[in-house]
């Protein structure tokens, strides 16, 4: 149950664990970071991974949430992820089948047929989803939730106003 809601709640946790513009470049950069919401056992393309453990070694069982950004605020990220897990236990949410396929190698149609949804591609997309989340607002509290959203919207606006060296090199000669 915990894993099931952690998977469902993972989309909300992404907003707290991947809270910077560059976080999404890592998720969608093709560097073995998860880009889709799914789970598996020994599948490194899965967002949630539950590695197999040896018989009699049940204490070594673990769940890996593979989208956590190294610069995330651990208090926010773990609060939402743990709350999602507890919510799954309370609601006795059922977990679908594990994904053994390399999700990056599947076509969009194959992923869609399997019910595998993409993670947000940008901070802006993540914020739009988070704004609709009563779950995250309840976990963080309205005050912290509002402050977080305001802060991240400001950061996104500042980012969008920047002209990067890439843009200058790519487009200036075409003027």
Predicted regions and their residues:
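Alpha-helix boundary/capping residues
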Residues: 10, 96, 133-134
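Acidic, glycine-enriched catalytic cores built around paired aspartates
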Residues: 101-175
